[in-house]
Amino acid sequence: MFICRKAFVALAAILLILTACAPPTPFDSITKTPRPGGTASASATETPAPATSSLRVEKEALRGAQVNIWHPWFGAEASLFQSQVTQFNTENEWGIVVNGQSQGNYSELFLQTDAALEDSSYPQIVVGLPEHALEWQEHVVDLQPYISDPLYGMSADEISDFPAVIWNQDEVDGKRFGVPAQRTARFVLYNQSWARELGFDSPPATSSEFEQQACAAHKALGEDEDSTNDPLGGWLIDTHAMTPLSWMIAFGGGVQEEEGYRFLTPGNIAAFRFVKTLQQKNCAWVASLDLPIPDRLAARQALFATASLEDLPDQARAFSVANNTDEWTVLEFPGDERAALVVYGSSYIMFESDDVTQLASWLFMRWLLSAENQVRWVQSTGLFPLRSSTMQLLGDYSSSHPQWAEAVELLSDGETTPRLASWRVVRVMLEDGFRDMFDTIRHPDLTAGQVPLILKQMDDTAEDLNN
């Protein structure tokens, strides 16, 4: 009835290959020294001593330094990144030359980088996921000395400008494996207008309230004149890996335990039983592929759906195309006593080379993280602003994208994904196992009572993948 452990591992490997998929002013340490001599009325001022770098690279040595960077982006994102590369090459004071190359998606980037590391033909920077950096850790440069450098680093105020959930994702056991490039999250989308018509004045704050509203939506469709929508309403089931992870955390669970994984926990059992029970009550359903999810939410086929931050523009367009003026918003995943939001995304990762090239690479990375550059990324991608100060430059964007602005307000509640190299394959297993739980054709007799067996199988498979 369940997929065997070996099949899980094999499927994870196949999916990884096939799946195609996010300048601060240098801080000068100033020491004022009283002027010797003088009178009591004299102004005791002194020219601040210039900051000096501890990185053992003369400024002149940076001129002409070549930095190659591989990234996963294509289309508009790739064009924007290339324009920023061109701008940096034109304007940077050191004469550094950056060359960008797209690998098409994260899966291909990982494979190409993995191969390049074997024959020492790798770039200086890659835009990869934090778990990728942990997989390559013997080649990855610890960025902490660059961040803390008196001349070329970042001040405490600059670092605190990054929300902790964004900044801390790349640090493991005191080593900084990267700095954030893009961050997103998975949200529950909620049709407020329809909910009010169903008698609910506020969004669900708990899982029980979520169930109550989802079942009310299903009941309403079953009682209208259109018999074709009788199976619909409620939550439109989604099996993106961050969806089950968010549900588990909302119920007090999670997946990482020290340097490994643990799926079979009371919180995870409660989370999986909750969503499976919703399906058994017909208050949650799996959509066919003939109509996109945004169109279904806009057509009131579901009261709740789940989507990532970058999907919000598509959802807004779907409501517009449908001439649907319903109000909708984004929510965290509700549990019994808390809600959950999982923040994830890509990072700039530096590989070992020589002192000059590494400093040149860092200076480009630091430049990309400026608030002004982040504005362009947000406007193009719809993802989170990496810095709090960026929001001050996005007033017009916030006004015209209200659901995005609401999502940003939830960022302080965010949590990170597991900081383990094996997460890149374990998340594929989690996604597949969660999807399989809702497959009533393969498993017509599967009930919420069998959830512990599913989670035990995930434990066993994750142990294999983590070793």
Model-derived segments and their meaning:
Residues 38, 196, 412-467:
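Conserved C-terminal helix/tail region of periplasmic/extracytoplasmic solute-binding proteins
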Residues 49-59, 129-187, 227, 325-332:
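Hinge/lid segment of periplasmic solute-binding proteins
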Residues 57, 144-162, 226-235, 252-271, ...:
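Short, solvent-exposed loop/beta-turn-alpha elements that line the ligand-binding surface or hinge
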Residues 87, 91-161, 196-199, 295-296, ...:
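Extracytoplasmic "Venus flytrap"/periplasmic binding protein-like
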Residues 172-181, 186, 211-261, 302:
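Extracytoplasmic/periplasmic solute-binding protein
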Residues 196-198, 269, 277-284, 319-386, ...:
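Extracytoplasmic/periplasmic substrate-recognition and gating elements
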Residues 213-218, 258-288, 333:
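Glycine-centered hinge/linker elements that transmit conformational signals in sensory
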Residues 328-331, 379-432, 436:
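Long, aromatic- and glycine/proline-rich binding clefts that accommodate carbohydrate-like moieties
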